[in-house]
Amino acid sequence: MTEREYNQTIKMECIIIMSIIKNQVLDNFFRITVVCIDEYEKKIPHGRIYNNYLEKGVEFTGVIDLLKKIELLLEEMNCPQSFSERRVFRPSNIPLKASQTDDDVKEGKLATFSIRLLFRQNASWQGSVTWHEGRTEESFRSVLELLLLIDSALTE
């Protein structure tokens, strides 16, 4: 192998490595979804979700609406990839409607959580959640565990 061929090989390997690193950074960039809770009346959350994939925040009302909108976002981004196909009785057409509130303020009136989703396995989510006001982070193994962590922060 000539010196020129060797240098081209090294250059190609560097390009491949940089591409892999860039994809991993972008992957991590989209894995965090910020959930801003503005109201929590009768244990029904109202607020907004933000993700770097979205141009603006998305409003939600209730736990089901929150989970469906995050799941729709995850499906659109394909990140993290689901390990199983979603099953439904009827397809849902929930649009990711932009929030009407000021998008510069990514804090909830009651609480703000950063959800880092690492996996979507066994028809659930796994990752970690950071409660900004309480300055604590906890791992969760299921959506139920995530919701219980959020509820415990909101009912303290």
Give, region by region, the residue ranges found by the protein language model:
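Mixed-charge, glycine-accented linear interaction segment located at domain edges/termini
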Residues: 54-61, 67-75, 122, 126-156
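Short aromatic-glycine-enriched beta-strand elements
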Residues: 45-47, 126-127
